[in-house]
Regions:
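A membrane-cytosol interface segment of integral membrane proteins
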Residues: 146-175
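Membrane-embedded catalytic scaffold of the fatty acid hydroxylase/desaturase
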Residues: 1-147
Length: 175
């Protein structure tokens, strides 16, 4: 049956654009910047983020369900994404270059988290780098690894302060 493969491609395509919007639309970046603020990438970094940032993939799941894909298949994609996120953020130095144009690797995703000028608007894909290749956001320099992580903005320390950070200019009377 081809439906799971079509669903997978549609899911990945939707997550690519949602993720890209989180970087390119300033109000969304306010939330997503917390995930990118870590200056040392490791598997725990995959869990660092504002709760609203978790809605990043919601459109992809809603799209799958609306398109008639089963809840089971949608759940499999959800679990796969969490597990892959742990792997992609891991502090590993594996040379998986032959795979970079076929599947996302930790090195590919580390470039996405890099705060180096040439890498900032790149590598949004979740599973398949084809979307970055098609839309001009693929970045994998040869024989070089990211040296600088984090963001230019000052993100406060502490969970409460990070929860409030994206809302700081919205006139919230509670703080």
């Amino acid at each position: 049956e081809i439906a799971p493969f079509v669903g997978f491609a549609l899911f990945d395509f939707t997550v690519y654009w949602t993720h890209r919007f989180y970087h390119e639309i300033p109000v969304l970046w306010e939330f997503h910047s917390i995930h990118h603020s870590t200056e040392e990438l490791d598997w725990v970094s995959g869990f660092r983020g504002h709760p609203f940032d978790g809605t990043l993939v919601a459109p992809a799941f809603i799209f799958l369900i609306a398109a008639g894909f089963s809840l089971e298949l949608t759940g499999i994609f959800a679990v796969a994404q969490v597990l892959l996120g742990l792997f992609l953020h891991a502090n590993v130095r594996w040379r998986l270059r032959p795979l970079h144009r076929l599947v996302i690797t930790p090195e590919f995703h580390h470039w996405h988290h890099s705060n180096e000028k040439d890498a900032i608007w790149t590598n949004y894909s979740t599973f398949l780098p084809i979307w970055d290749l098609l839309f001009g956001t693929y970045f994998m320099p040869k024989d070089k690894r990211p040296q600088v992580y984090g963001v230019d903005e000052h993100i406060p320390d502490g969970i409460i302060e990070q929860l409030k950070y994206p809302l700081r200019d919205m006139g919230n009377p509670l703080w």
